[in-house]
């Protein structure tokens, strides 16, 4: 019986101790007053019942997301948020309908945008002269299985070359409806990034011109970077594979 095994009728997880919950270099974990706790992680990768002797098997950490930040946000953050608010109102979109929350965490600004307003917000961030976030640096997929109703997140880092500023736009979708509008028409550089995020997380980017796998084979089952993907992988499926001649291969553009 391992130390983590409940005894008798006690089905509660063990209480975390200082060593088990220590952050980098032994520092205590951050305690953000507005943090949203969406789950608890047990062990290094959430795996139980192994012969782990490293000590990480007893790791117990809350899974948290930064909560919303109240204004003022400081520095140019207020200028960007105020200008975006004005631009949205002028376009007929209420600011509160388009954005779920605004987060300032570790000196960085993140705009949490509802997916149905993602394209509108992105276009305003790109085109408004006072904003001018001309460059999208990519798309990062994240899977939070415990974040009920918003398990799949897509994060877009945006850079303003004109004003030398960097922020993030984040949106989400549920596992049961993993659709997010593509930003290809606003930022063409998201082409392959959205394909990669679809390939590894299963997010369907509506409006993408060619949303196909980019790394895994076309007939691969599942999305390898999701938390529910088997940690040990799956049997190799390349046996008997046939490489089509050039005139039969799939076009990527």
From Swiss-Prot:
InterPro entries (UniProt xref): NADH_DH_suC, NADH_quin_OxRdtase_su_C/D-like, NADH_UbQ_OxRdtase_30kDa_su
Catalyzed reactions per annotation: a quinone + NADH + 5 H(+)(in) = a quinol + NAD(+) + 4 H(+)(out)
Keywords of this entry: Cell membrane, Membrane, NAD, Quinone, Translocase, Transport
Protein location: Cell membrane
Cellular component, GO annotation: plasma membrane
Example GO molecular function: NADH dehydrogenase (ubiquinone) activity
Cited function: NDH-1 shuttles electrons from NADH, via FMN and iron-sulfur (Fe-S) centers, to quinones in the respiratory chain. The immediate electron acceptor for the enzyme in this species is believed to be a menaquinone. Couples the redox reaction to proton translocation (for every two electrons transferred, four hydrogen ions are translocated across the cytoplasmic membrane), and thus conserves the redox energy in a proton gradient.
Name assigned to this protein: NADH-quinone oxidoreductase subunit C
Organism encoding this protein: Nocardia farcinica (strain IFM 10152)
Lineage of producing organism: Bacteria, Bacillati, Actinomycetota, Actinomycetes, Mycobacteriales
């Amino acid at each position: 019986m391992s130390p983590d095994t409940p005894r008798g009728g006690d089905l509660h997880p063990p209480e975390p101790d200082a060593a088990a919950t220590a952050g980098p270099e032994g520092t205590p974990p951050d305690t953000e007053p507005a943090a949203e706790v969406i789950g608890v992680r047990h062990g290094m990768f959430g795996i139980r019942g192994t012969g782990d002797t490293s000590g990480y098997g007893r790791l117990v950490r809350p899974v948290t997301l930064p909560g919303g930040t109240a204004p003022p946000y400081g520095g140019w953050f207020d200028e960007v948020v105020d200008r975006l608010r004005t631009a949205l109102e002028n376009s007929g979109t209420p600011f509160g309908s388009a954005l779920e929350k605004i987060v300032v965490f570790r000196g960085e600004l993140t705009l949490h945008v509802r997916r149905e307003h993602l394209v509108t917000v992105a276009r305003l961030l790109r085109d408004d002269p006072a904003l001018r976030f001309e460059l999208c640096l990519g798309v990062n997929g994240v899977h939070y299985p415990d974040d009920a109703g918003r398990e799949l997140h897509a994060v877009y880092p945006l850079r303003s070359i004109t004003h030398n500023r960097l922020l993030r736009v984040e949106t989400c979708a549920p596992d049961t409806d993993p659709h997010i509008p593509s930003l290809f028409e606003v930022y063409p550089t998201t082409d392959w990034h959205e394909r990669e995020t679809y390939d590894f997380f299963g997010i369907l980017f509506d409006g993408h011109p060619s949303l196909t796998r980019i790394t895994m084979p076309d007939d691969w089952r599942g999305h390898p970077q999701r938390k529910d993907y088997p940690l040990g992988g799956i049997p190799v499926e390349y046996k008997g594979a046939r490489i089509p001649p050039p005139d039969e291969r799939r076009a990527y553009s």
